[in-house]
Amino acid sequence: GIYPPSEGKMLIRPPGQNPRKLNGLKPNHVTENGLARTFQNIRLFQNMTVLENVMIGRHCRTSSGIIGAILKGKSNKHEEAQIVEDSYEVLEKIGLAGFVNEFAKNLPYGAQRRLEIARAMATDPFLLLLDEPAAGMNPLETKELDDLIVKIRDQEGISILLIEHDMKLVMSLSDSIYVVDYGKKIAQGTPEEIRNNPAVIKAYLGEEVDA
């Protein structure tokens, strides 16, 4: 939705439906098809509360949308109340229920990352794309992120597409891994297959040296 592909097709298959082509769709239409994402660089509304950030994500699943929420007509009061309830529920799952009225800019770095994931989850996706979510995190924050992603996958039934350089995190979370080196796929397989792949070892660890 942000950068059009130079070639090929992007297809997404919502549960129980036929594949849909994403090429050429606007970002909001991509979201409506069940794909949500976070960015490598945090893109929160820093001067809005934690709750308001998540509510913005939820508005894509309403009939009134963002404009209706701003105008606050009588017809959408019930819908707005439902958005608040749904947003609280997401924050509870993510572990941020105690920060609903805090400004996003005041959250610790790891909590800001969680808030981005919460906002993406509020769109009710079946596929969640996480772009280097562990970037800039310390080991404790990375472990907490690992636990959160497992929870989202196993308890919420949301598929995760993870783009990440932290190989320990990738190996612990993934069922299937694609390895890209300078824009070209050099390997595909299970974590164990990738761990023992000569091309991956060469690209990421350097040439093997005899002891």
Question: Model segments located where?
Answer:
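Glycine-rich phosphate-binding loops of nucleotide-dependent enzymes
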Residues: 1-211
